[in-house]
From Swiss-Prot:
Any single GO BP term: protein insertion into mitochondrial inner membrane
Record field: transmembrane: 74-94, 123-143, 170-190
Any one Gene Ontology molecular-function term assigned to this protein's record: protein transmembrane transporter activity
Quaternary structure (record): Component of the TIM22 complex, whose core is composed of TIMM22, associated with peripheral protein FXC1/TIMM10B and the 70 kDa heterohexamer. In most cases, the 70 kDa complex is composed of TIMM9 and TIMM10 (TIMM10A or TIMM10B). A small fraction of the 70 kDa complex is composed of TIMM8 (TIMM8A/DDP1 or TIMM8B/DDP2) and TIMM13. The TIM22 complex also contains AGK and TIMM29. Interacts directly with TIMM9, TIMM10A and FXC1/TIMM10B. Interacts (when oxidized) with TIMM29; interaction is direct.
Disease cited in the entry: Combined oxidative phosphorylation deficiency 43: An autosomal recessive mitochondrial disorder characterized by onset at birth, intrauterine growth retardation, hypotonia, myopathy, feeding difficulties associated with gastroesophageal reflux, and persistently elevated serum lactate and creatine kinase. Brain imaging shows delayed myelination. Muscle biopsy shows decreased activities of mitochondrial respiratory chain complexes I, III, and IV.
Name of the featured protein: Mitochondrial import inner membrane translocase subunit Tim22
Annotated InterPro entries: TIM22 (IPR039175)
Main subcellular localisation: mitochondrion
Family, similarity comment: Belongs to the Tim17/Tim22/Tim23 family.
PTM info: Disulfide bonds promote efficient assembly of the TIM22 complex.
Disulfide pairings: 69-141, 160-179
Alphabetic keyword roster: Disease variant, Disulfide bond, Membrane, Mitochondrion, Mitochondrion inner membrane, Primary mitochondrial disease, Protein transport, Translocation, Transmembrane, Transmembrane helix, Transport
One Pfam short name: Tim17
Amino acid sequence: MAAAAPNAGGSAPETAGSAEAPLQYSLLLQYLVGDKRQPRLLEPGSLGGIPSPAKSEEQKMIEKAMESCAFKAALACVGGFVLGGAFGVFTAGIDTNVGFDPKDPYRTPTAKEVLKDMGQRGMSYAKNFAIVGAMFSCTECLIESYRGTSDWKNSVISGCITGGAIGFRAGLKAGAIGCGGFAAFSAAIDYYLR
């Protein structure tokens, strides 16, 4: 920086120090991402845009139906069925024992037998994934509605309920292990996604 010329009064030149005003860029950053940031009001009418019209009764009814626990559970059931079916067909495709007959180990299975086995495994996985998805989604929605908050505790509690219900078919110990395992998995997924 070039040397500053002395003032007319003969006093020493002012040095650039902490008394200097912050840069405009720093002020802008404080308002955009810093502690002076404020929530935006994104109403198009106040910004000079076209204001959005009020929602009709049909729109409100559709939104209410899509936010219901029954719709969320049905959506998770269908998604779980599709994902489980794809996963079952994939695992059957890489399994070397698909279509294998233990009575005649040297016989090569036909394409029809392999496809039948893949379909059976795909359907089995699809049903299991659909049930787990529907149970988890429904319990999480009900817990969220009951508690009135949307946080990580909802998924942990619903994971424990779902895992416990699935594991309880094999006994009390399996139910407790299923509860803990599914709750831990739900917490890990929720932590990763949020």
